[in-house]
């Protein structure tokens, strides 16, 4: 019974709680019909009741949970609306350049259309000339230039037409491309820029050599013997170094300068061949009396020419013409020689072979077969 009473008491106490709970809600319902402001002030009254805080918190939380959810829901549309507004703003910003671009593009197009344009016309009849091509394209607009490419045999079958206005050029290209003129299908295309290639500079010498005087004297001795050695000898002012007036040397000889053979022209110095001279060189000139006593260094371009000195004068000599008719002769290598004025005073000289060279002056041959001779002093008498 006691337990039942306690349960009843507990039930009575629990039943009393809803009555008290109903009062604050009932009191709070009167204010909202007038204004929203009294409700805000009447709502705090139930909160101070300490006995029902545990029970009232749940409905309060439930009540408070809805407004925040509503506020969040209200804020989210605002945010979305703000986002949409900002998005539209960005779109309008982006749209502004797009609106401006069509304005700039027509100006660029008009500028391009007003510029000259060149067309490449190919497969045109070979009898066509510039007036014919101008007449064909002149109906589409003003033409600045017409050019048909020719070679030594005539027209090459293509040319160029330059219009003052690029729009006229485009219209002419569309109309005339693929048309048949005198049995030939004409092709009209936009001319492309030429690709400029680096052409080799033209060398003043026809053989393509551009050497310094030392190396050039080896590979082109006659040129430097005429322009360097003899000019230097004439500048000395001495009779023993003077060159004969019959020798003609020009500095404009192209490449290997082998001019026409004259009576006294001997570029290889035939009067010195086989004499046992101190230093043999390609700097030798003709055979004037007295002979030139000084010669430069000793490198021969070809081994065959160097070998004839060791073989002796008689071993190398060819059949000499008579003194009355002796002018000049040339061997099979294109070298021009004059008749030796001293051959009547010379006997066959086998002693001027290799054995006649002093010790320590044996010939040395490089990879070109060139021979170096340094047997006697630089200067010697005749």
From Swiss-Prot:
Residue numbers carrying Asymmetric dimethylarginine: 317
User: GO cellular-component terms in the record?
Assistant: cytoplasm; nucleus
Coiled-coil annotation reads none
**Single GO MF descriptor:** mRNA binding
List every stretch annotated Disordered. Answer: 1-121, 357-382
User: Site positions for Interaction with RNA, renumbered to this chain?
Assistant: 118, 126-127, 151, 156, 160, 184, 194
- What are the subcellular locations of this protein? Nucleus; Cytoplasm
Q: For bias kind Polar residues, which ranges apply?
A: 70-87, 100-113
Keywords tagged on the record: Cytoplasm, Methylation, mRNA processing, mRNA splicing, Nucleus, RNA-binding
Primary residence: nucleus
Low complexity bias spans: 88-99
RRM domain span: 117-193
Its BP terms in the Gene Ontology are:
mRNA processing; nervous system development; regulation of alternative mRNA splicing, via spliceosome; RNA splicing
Which Gene3D superfamilies does the entry link to?
A: 3.30.70.330
State whether it acts alone or in a complex, and with which partners, per the record.
Binds to the C-terminus of ATXN2.
Described purpose of this protein according to its UniProt entry: RNA-binding protein that regulates alternative splicing events by binding to 5'-UGCAUGU-3' elements. Prevents binding of U2AF2 to the 3'-splice site. Regulates alternative splicing of tissue-specific exons and of differentially spliced exons during erythropoiesis.
Can you say what this protein is called? Answer: RNA binding protein fox-1 homolog 1
User: What is the organism of origin for this protein?
Assistant: Pongo abelii
- Gene that this sequence comes from: RBFOX1
């Amino acid at each position: 019974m006691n337990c039942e009473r306690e349960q009843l008491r507990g039930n009575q106490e629990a039943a009393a709680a809803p009555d008290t709970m109903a009062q604050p809600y009932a009191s709070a319902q009167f204010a909202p019909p007038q204004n929203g402001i009294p409700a805000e002030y009447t709502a705090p009254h139930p909160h101070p009741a300490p006995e029902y805080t545990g029970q009232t918190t749940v409905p309060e939380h439930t009540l408070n949970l809805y407004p925040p959810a509503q506020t969040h829901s209200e804020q989210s549309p605002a945010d979305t609306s703000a986002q949409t507004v900002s998005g539209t703003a960005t779109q309008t910003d982006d749209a502004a350049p797009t609106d401006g671009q069509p304005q700039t593009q027509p100006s660029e197009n008009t500028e391009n259309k007003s510029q000259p344009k060149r067309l490449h016309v190919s497969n045109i009849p070979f009898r066509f000339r510039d007036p014919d091509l101008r007449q064909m394209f002149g109906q589409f607009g003003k033409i600045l230039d017409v050019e048909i490419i020719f070679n030594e045999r005539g027209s090459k079958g293509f040319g160029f037409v330059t219009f003052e206005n690029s729009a006229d050029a485009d219209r002419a290209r569309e109309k005339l491309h693929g048309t048949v003129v005198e049995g030939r299908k004409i092709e009209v295309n936009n001319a492309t820029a030429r690709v400029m290639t680096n052409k080799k500079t033209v060398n003043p010498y026809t053989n393509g050599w551009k050497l310094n005087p030392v190396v050039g004297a080896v590979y082109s001795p006659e040129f430097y013997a005429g322009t360097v050695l003899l000019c230097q000898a004439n500048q000395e002012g001495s009779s023993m170094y003077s060159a004969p007036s019959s020798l003609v040397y020009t500095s404009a000889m192209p490449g290997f300068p082998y001019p026409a053979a004259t009576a006294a022209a001997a570029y290889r110095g035939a009067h010195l061949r086989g004499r046992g001279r101190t230093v043999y060189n390609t700097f030798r000139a003709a055979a004037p009396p007295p002979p030139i006593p000084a010669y430069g260094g000793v490198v021969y371009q070809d081994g065959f020419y160097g070998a004839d000195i060791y073989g002796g004068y008689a071993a190398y000599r060819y059949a000499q013409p008579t003194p009355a008719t002796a002018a000049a002769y040339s061997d099979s290598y294109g070298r021009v020689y004059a008749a030796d004025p001293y051959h009547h005073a010379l006997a066959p000289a086998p002693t001027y072979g290799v054995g006649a060279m002093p010790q320590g002056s044996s010939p040395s041959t490089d990879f070109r077969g060139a021979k170096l001779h340094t047997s006697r002093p630089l200067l010697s008498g005749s």
